[in-house]
């Protein structure tokens, strides 16, 4: 993109970008490339595409805010309190005063919570900010269900809830307070893959009385997730067994149907596989939309059969591609 912009725009051009939609890792090289071409990269206050959609009465979809659930220690092998203690130890090693977690899977992992805001992904739209004395979840309207709060309190986490939209203002406030109360020794840790908007907020929007360091590197949660404990490993093994049973039962059913002369469409096959998976213990849902490609359809990347109109039947002499997955506790 930077090559196209520098080749097609004249010197002195200003390129506007919504900082919520681009990571710091993407922003920095783009800014450098434009600067070399005597151009400017500017963060726009409001997303211009969204503004246009409002004017055209084609409203952007609302952000989902489905219920969240807690995953007990028999599945995770570690309480959220243990995980947060380890993160605070890492923070102390780097002498940081706040850790900002922006990746949705990392928030879910840290708190042992799961959601369903994104299809086929057990995550929920949120941010998590950890300090030596507080744990704040920016989620939905900030009203965390009491049962979730009680469970986390039992695990040693006094979770505070704040509205999702308040994250940038909250980070700016934290940055300014750390700057005013220190002498350059305070810092905030956040991943380079966080949005440019989050980085700007954590920098106090450039309005700090004293220096504030930003530790912009891989999140410690990402590293913690790499090392699986014994409970997680055994969970993986058992999930593979259960899912394998469902898939074997499905193929046995499919062969029986076709050998017996019963017509089976791609859609019917996908639905039957889901039925078998639902019968397995701890099944939570598919991990992506099943791809049941019969014959020539098996060559189509990310194929998805239509439920409307004619249905492709799976014939006895067809090559049949089945790409599917399940998620379990």
Model feature map: region roles:
Residues 1-329:
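Active-site neighborhoods and metal-handling regions in enzymes and metal-associated proteins
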């Amino acid at each position: 993109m930077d090559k196209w912009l520098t080749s097609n725009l004249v010197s002195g051009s200003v390129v506007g970008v919504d900082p919520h939609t681009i990571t710091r890792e993407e922003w920095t090289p783009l800014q450098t490339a434009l600067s070399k071409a005597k151009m400017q990269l500017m963060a726009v206050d409001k997303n211009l595409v969204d503004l246009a959609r409002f004017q055209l009465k084609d409203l952007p979809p609302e952000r989902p805010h489905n219920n969240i659930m807690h995953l007990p220690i028999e599945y995770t092998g570690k309480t959220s309190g243990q995980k947060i203690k380890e993160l605070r130890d890492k923070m102390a090693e780097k002498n940081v005063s706040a850790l900002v977690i922006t990746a949705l899977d990392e928030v879910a992992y840290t708190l042992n919570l799961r959601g369903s805001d994104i299809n086929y992904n057990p995550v929920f739209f949120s941010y998590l900010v950890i300090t030596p004395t507080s744990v704040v979840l920016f989620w939905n309207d900030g009203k965390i269900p009491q049962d979730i709060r009680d469970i986390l309190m039992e695990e040693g986490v006094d979770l505070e809830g704040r509205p999702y939209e308040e994250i940038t203002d909250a980070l700016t406030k934290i940055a300014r307070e750390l700057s005013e109360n220190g002498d350059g020794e305070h810092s905030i840790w956040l991943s380079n893959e966080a949005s440019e908007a989050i980085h700007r907020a954590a920098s106090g929007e450039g309005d700090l009385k004293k220096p504030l360091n930003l530790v912009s590197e891989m999140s410690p949660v990402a590293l913690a997730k790499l090392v699986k404990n014994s409970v997680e490993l055994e969970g993986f093994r058992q999930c593979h067994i259960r899912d394998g049973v469902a898939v074997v039962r499905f193929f046995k059913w499919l062969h029986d149907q076709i050998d017996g002369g019963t017509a089976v469409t791609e859609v019917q096959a996908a639905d039957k596989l889901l039925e078998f998976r639902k019968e397995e213990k701890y099944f939570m849902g598919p991990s992506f939309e099943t791809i049941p490609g019969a014959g020539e359809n098996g060559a189509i990347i990310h194929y998805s059969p239509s439920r409307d109109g004619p249905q492709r039947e799976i014939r006895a002499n067809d090559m049949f591609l089945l790409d599917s997955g399940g998620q379990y506790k």
